[in-house]
């Protein structure tokens, strides 16, 4: 059995009790199992295993998130009654990065959170079924059969569909920013002792056999970046139980040791390279927007909970979501957890590489109070618990959390522009439009002024010619008189 690194708990504070009222849950998870990021032209990864595409979610990855969705249904719908049994758009908001594997993961997750229910009552009016068709010709056999099968159901087996919004986890994908980030990360490679030592150890154990394996296949420079690519393929193959016999037979490498070494390589890569610059610029660049969004939804929910009239049936006044779901990557989960480790002063060794379908949660609860007392609640009456894969990372009152966050200079667009482009002013689309309109207006003003001067000059010349005839005119007239 291969070791999957467990989270080291960085707090042993007891969770809130089940008698408390859970009012909010913010979920941020990594996508499920995927194919390797690097594939050769022949469709093989760096271990010689065949794949059909790079980095796409696999059926195993879909199942991971379906089961995680079922687990979250048990906790947040059945156990804590945070969400309704059926999807309510006022209760849940879902975001994903604009990447296939995160979108498919969150779609699979939702099917577990709100499973297919053949016995669910639909809202279609039987008298209106003739109108429940698109305005084009659909009179062929397959569709006719589907119409009869659906009857008063909107979708087969009353499956639930939920809107998913895009969130730009990377914030800025410009060439200048990408180059700046890569240069900063490469400088970290050269100075981080953990990276240097790991690379030396890896080469000592595996360099010769790997070079022999790759001989006449690809040219390989066994630096730390290449090591992480090899390990990415190893982890993907291992999770999927792909046939790696050829690789381990040819190299004579101990499979269990190599897989554990690869998990360690990925951990060091994320912890000590991707977000480890001295000024935390890479960390703040990637995570500020996500932290602000999570905090925004938490504050909004608490504020509405304080003023909420539970007897009201008007959702327009109290429509802040009770749950936020973010479908992200190992980079986004790592950035989030390193943010708390560094700025909340926890031990760096508590970081753990987030494996496929890892989940973090922000849960807010309070003591049960009667309706009259609720309006007197304060942020200090709400407890925030943060978990990584069900292990408690920290808990504190919400006012303490906001105080800690308030001391951190989260980045805005100005910080990002300065980081990417230096002190040079950045011409955004709106600014370019404004400047262009200003230039056009100035040109029009100049043209109008020139026209006014021309008209005035022509008028003056006309008046002069009327009152003071030219000498030539006088001569001509005299000659004619003679």
Language model: regions and residue ranges:
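Signature for phosphate-centric chemistry
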Residues: 20-93, 97-324, 328-451
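Cytosolic C-terminal tails of single-pass type I membrane
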Residues: 459-482
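Sec-dependent signal peptide recognition
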Residues: 1-9
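N-terminal signal peptide
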Residues: 8-21
């Amino acid at each position: 059995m291969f070791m999957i690194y467990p989270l080291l708990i960085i707090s042993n504070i007891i969770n809130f009790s089940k008698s408390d009222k859970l009012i909010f849950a913010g979920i941020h998870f990594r996508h499920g199992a995927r194919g390797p990021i690097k594939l050769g032209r022949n469709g093989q990864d760096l271990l010689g295993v065949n794949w059909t595409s790079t980095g796409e979610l696999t059926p195993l990855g879909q199942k991971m998130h379906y089961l995680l969705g079922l687990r979250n249904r048990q906790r947040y719908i059945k156990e804590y009654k945070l969400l309704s049994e059926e999807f309510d758009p006022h209760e849940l908001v879902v975001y994903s990065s604009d990447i296939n594997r995160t979108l498919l993961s969150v779609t699979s997750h939702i099917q577990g959170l709100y499973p297919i229910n053949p016995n669910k009552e639909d809202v279609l009016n039987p008298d209106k079924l003739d109108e429940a068709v698109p305005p084009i010709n659909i009179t062929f056999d397959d569709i006719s059969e589907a119409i009869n099968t659906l009857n008063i159901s909107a979708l087969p087996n009353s499956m639930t569909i939920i809107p998913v919004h895009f969130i730009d986890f990377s914030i800025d994908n410009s060439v200048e920013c990408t180059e700046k980030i890569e240069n900063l990360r490469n400088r970290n490679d050269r100075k981080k002792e953990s990276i240097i030592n790991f690379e030396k150890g890896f080469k000592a154990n595996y360099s010769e056999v790997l070079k022999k394996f790759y001989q006449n296949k690809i040219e390989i420079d066994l630096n730390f970046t290449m090591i992480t690519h090899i390990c990415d393929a190893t982890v993907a193959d291992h999770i999927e139980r792909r046939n790696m016999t050829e690789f381990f037979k040819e190299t004579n490498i101990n499979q269990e040791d190599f897989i554990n070494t690869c998990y360690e390589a990925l951990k060091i890569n994320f912890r000590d390279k991707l977000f480890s610059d001295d000024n935390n610029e890479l960390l703040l660049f990637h995570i500020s927007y996500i932290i602000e969004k999570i905090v925004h939804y938490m504050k909004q929910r608490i504020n509405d909970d304080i003023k909420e009239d539970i007897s009201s049936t008007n959702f327009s006044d109290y429509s802040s979501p009770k749950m936020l779901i973010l479908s992200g990557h190992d980079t986004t989960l790592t950035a989030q957890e390193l943010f708390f480790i560094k700025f909340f002063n926890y031990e760096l060794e508590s970081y753990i590489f987030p494996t496929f379908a890892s989940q973090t949660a922000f849960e807010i609860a309070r003591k049960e109070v009667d309706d009259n007392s609720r309006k007197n609640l304060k942020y200090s009456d709400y407890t925030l618990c943060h978990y990584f894969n069900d292990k408690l990372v920290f808990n504190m009152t919400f006012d303490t959390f906001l105080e800690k966050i308030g001391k951190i200079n989260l980045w805005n667009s100005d910080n990002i522009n300065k980081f990417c482009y230096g002190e040079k002013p950045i011409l955004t689309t709106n600014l370019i439009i404004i400047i262009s309109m200003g230039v056009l207006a100035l040109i029009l003003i100049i043209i109008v002024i020139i026209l006014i001067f021309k008209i005035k000059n022509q008028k003056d010349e006309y008046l002069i010619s009327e009152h003071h005839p030219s000498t030539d005119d006088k001569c001509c007239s005299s000659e004619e008189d003679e």
